[in-house]
Amino acid sequence: PLPVAKVASIKLKVNFDFDSSVVQEQYFNDLQELAEFLKRFSDLQVDVEGHTDSTGPENYNALLSQRRAEAVVDLLVNQYGIEARRLEAKGYGESQPVASNDTLEGRAQNRRVMATLEVEYEE
């Protein structure tokens, strides 16, 4: 029989408290799942993207978003054994909102780190 092409994908979303880059414990299982995915597909590299809401100066938010992305990368490397060279932390500040910054709920959704991976493989 011919090999069957399959697609595997995973999406990580970690939200943050206001003005914080501390990854909360509730996201550790999600990080574990991403780490297992990366171990299964060992040639994959991933951009870990940090974001903020629009509260505060734009340049501060750019730095905060970078710190958020780096916090997730640090956990993946130090707690879950992923090689640092496979991960790139990128801070996008407030430039890519997923919700309105006019509401408390919207701002909470915008304070996030995202990583999305998709891979095609044969079985």
What function would you assign to each model-found segment?
Residues P1-Q45, N78, I82-R85, E118-E123:
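Periplasmic peptidoglycan-binding/tethering modules of Gram-negative envelope proteins
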Residues Q24, H51-E123:
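Periplasmic OmpA-like peptidoglycan-binding domain that tethers envelope proteins to the cell wall
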